[in-house]
Each structure stands twice: as structure tokens, then as C-alpha cells.
Amino acid sequence: MAGSLSEIKAKIISTEKTSKITSAMRMVSSAKLVKSEQAARDFQIYASKIRQITTDLLKSDLTTGSDNPMLVSRPVKKTGYIVITSDKGLVGGYNSKILKSIMDMIQEYHAAGDYEIISIGSIGSDFFKARGMNVAFELRGLADQPSFDQVGRIISQSVDMFVNEIFDELYVCYNHHVNSLTSQVRVQRMLPISDLVAEEAAEEGVTGFELEPNRHVILEQLLPQFTESLIYGAIIDAKTAEHAAGMTAMQTATDNAKHVINDLTIQYNRARQAAITQEITEIVAGANALE
């Protein structure tokens, strides 16, 4: 009985230590989430402005007949997917949701050689490589608050692959941050930009432009920046969802630890009470035997 009591006590102490760790990790994730949400709000100021300029320019008559490759829809022979996952675990179902979605899409719509994956995050990179899938580029070790300098190269490489017709359309697959408890899987087409033209075509209120030096030069510079801003915005959004998932997972782990501690404490008290009762019974029996 003494051995059982000591084992239960050791489990209680161990679980309490684990609870303190998960509670601290929840607080860290919470702080990261606040910073990421602020970064996302700040970025939206820039993103909304460049979107407005781009869509107004694309809707204007000045862009009619543009041959810019980023605007041209062509027969789809190969598709590119930028897949954003985390570099570490302990984020609940954050990674499994996005990986299941991309696997379902590839199995349903693609043969072995007609897709390319650009993987952001170690979990996704390891997952795809373990299955022998087509990974063109990968980026590991993404910062908690990723700067454009950190991700700019892989974004530019992805856009260049479309422009150079290595693939004919580009999607970004990521978890969209809704709130601290919820995220949604998004598979968003980024290239060609013809989707954006169709979405905005019915809206009124085109801003007038005086274009210098000319339309062609402006589009050559603006469209890559616009597309890169959309992809970067998705990365920020995904990182925010990751921090929220980490916070929720650690809160759940802390709550579960508390339940385990409570159950173990009840078990310990019952075992201790049984041990005391047994000792009293043995003492009384011994005293009666001496009479």
C-alpha cells in the first residue's frame, strides 16, 4: 500500500509540473497571437491600397488587350500549390486539417507529374517528402512574426514559375484565422489574376489615372508586387492561426492536466484512507489477541 501511495503521489507531482509547462506555453502563444493579429491589421492597410490601385487599373479601358502573362489564362497542364504548415507540433489539428485538404485535392484532380508543391513549414515538407511527392521549393524555420525579407525569395520563385510556364495556375493552401478558437482551411487561387478582374468587373467607381511612363511598364512592376502581397498576407494569416491553435491546444492540455490531478488526488486520498483503516484494524486485532 505504501508503494501504491508513493506512486500516486509521484504521478500527481509529475502532472503538476506538466501543467505548469503547458500553462506557460499557452501564455507565450497568447502573446504571439496578439502580435500576429496586430501585424495582420497593419499589413491590411498596405494590402487594401495596392489591391485598390491594381483593380482600378485592371478595370479601366487602358488595360484592354493586355498580354501580361500574369493576366492570361492558359490551358492547365500543371498546377502549383503553396502549402503553409507549422515548423513544430503542439498546435492541435492545425497541420492535419491543411494536409488532409491538399492530399484530397491532389488525389482527386492530379496525376503524379502534373503538380508542384512549394512547402512553407517543416511539418509539411517532411510530410510530402516522406510520401515521395513533388516538392519544388521549401522554407523551414519561419519566424513567429515573418518579415517579407524572410519569405520574399520563395514567393518570387513561385511567381516566376508561373510566368515561365512551369505551371499554369498557382494556389495558396493555408489555415485562415477566424478567431482564437476557430480557423478555416482556404485554398485560394493567386495566379492568373483573371479571377480578380472578374470579381471586380461589376463594381463601379474606377479611380482615374495619369499613367507614366505607360501602361505596360506599370503592369510589369505592379502585378508581381500585388501577387506577392496576396501570398505574404496568406502567410501572416496562417501564422496567426498557428499561434491561436497553439494557445488553444495548450489550454486544453492544461485543463486536462487539472482533471488528471483531481482524479489522482481522489485516488490518493482513498488509498490513504484504506491504509489507515487497515492499520487501525490490525492494531485492534492485536490488542484483542493479547487479552
UniProtKB/Swiss-Prot annotation:
Its main location: membrane. GO terms for biological process: proton motive force-driven plasma membrane ATP synthesis. GO terms for molecular function: ATP binding; proton-transporting ATP synthase activity, rotational mechanism. It holds the Pfam family ATP-synt. CDD domains: F1-ATPase_gamma. InterPro entries: ATP_synth_F1_ATPase_gsu, ATP_synth_F1_gsu, ATP_synth_F1_gsu_CS. It is found in: Cell membrane. The keyword Iron-sulfur does not apply. It comes from the Bacteria. Disulfide bonds: none annotated. It is a peripheral membrane protein. The keyword Transport applies. Keywords: ATP synthesis, Cell membrane, CF(1), Hydrogen ion transport, Ion transport, Membrane, Transport. F-type ATPases have 2 components, CF(1) - the catalytic core - and CF(0) - the membrane proton channel. CF(1) has five subunits: alpha(3), beta(3), gamma(1), delta(1), epsilon(1). CF(0) has three main subunits: a, b and c. HAMAP family: ATP_synth_gamma_bact. Produces ATP from ADP in the presence of a proton gradient across the membrane. The gamma chain is believed to be important in regulating ATPase activity and the flow of protons through the CF(0) complex. PANTHER family: ATP SYNTHASE GAMMA CHAIN (PTHR11693), ATP SYNTHASE SUBUNIT GAMMA, MITOCHONDRIAL (PTHR11693:SF22). Belongs to the ATPase gamma chain family. This is ATP synthase gamma chain. The lineage of its organism: Bacteria, Bacillati, Bacillota, Bacilli, Lactobacillales.
